[in-house]
Amino acid sequence: MLFDSHLHLDQLSDENIQQTLAHSKIIGMLAVSTNLNSAKKLLNLKQTYPKKLYIAAGFHPEQQLPSLEEQKKLFQWIDEHHSSISAIGEVGLPHYSKRENPNLDYVPYIELLERFILIAKKWDLPLNLHIVHNDVEIALELLQKHNIQRAHFHWFKTDEKSFQKFFSTPYFASLTPDILWNSKTQYVAQHLSLNRLMIETDSPWQHEGFERAGISEQLLAVLQKLAELKSLPLHSVQKQILLNTQQFYRL
């Protein structure tokens, strides 16, 4: 059985959404939101597929910051619907936007991330994070400042120094199909304990070599490569990864 721990389900076509949720090999998925409208759409979908679809509410950091009024509405919506969501996400820092625009002011993004951390703590919800490379240390400092125990770093990749700091925390990381060729993803897979790993597709993102592959095919490819890197039987890796995800998100 397969569980996708991070995807943008609301960005798929209606037909693809139905096919994905009806797939017999997919036992569940954690769908993250990019803004308030995204979260609302996911909640409507969840009401149709309550046993397979779990959702997260947040604001994707690789976009223009929401206005204070938009932030207020999003936080209010989370307060009103916290019992229906399984995580706060996707939230984090705009690493790729900063790469394109070195003058981007990070301060308001850090402040917004801290607000999301506080609301996650308020409702005892885990965080599904967009945090990579040199943003890892910033995020770890915020998480530890607020004594956060459940944080999931999606599509995790960073330098060795930041990885060592991450390694000493209780936090989880998830792997995408780029484990097949990305040395940084392979490093995470090899050095992080199996009981701190999850798998994901970040669908509808198209991974190299998987442009026509469905979600189940992508997840299975990640598991197979992970089993190879860990020198473990595929069935035991698959069982542990599913258990990790269910326990982390309290499903």
Swiss-Prot record:
PROSITE patterns: TATD_1 (PS01137), TATD_3 (PS01091). Its EC number is 3.1.-.-. InterPro entries: DNase_TatD-rel_CS, Metal_Hydrolase, TatD-like. Binds 2 divalent metal cations per subunit. SUPFAM superfamilies: Metallo-dependent hydrolases. This is Uncharacterized metal-dependent hydrolase HI_1664. Keywords: Hydrolase, Metal-binding. It holds the Pfam family TatD_DNase. It is an enzyme of class 3 (hydrolase). It comes from Haemophilus influenzae (strain ATCC 51907 / DSM 11121 / KW20 / Rd). Its cofactor is a divalent metal cation. Belongs to the metallo-dependent hydrolases superfamily. TatD-type hydrolase family. GO terms for molecular function: hydrolase activity, acting on ester bonds; metal ion binding.
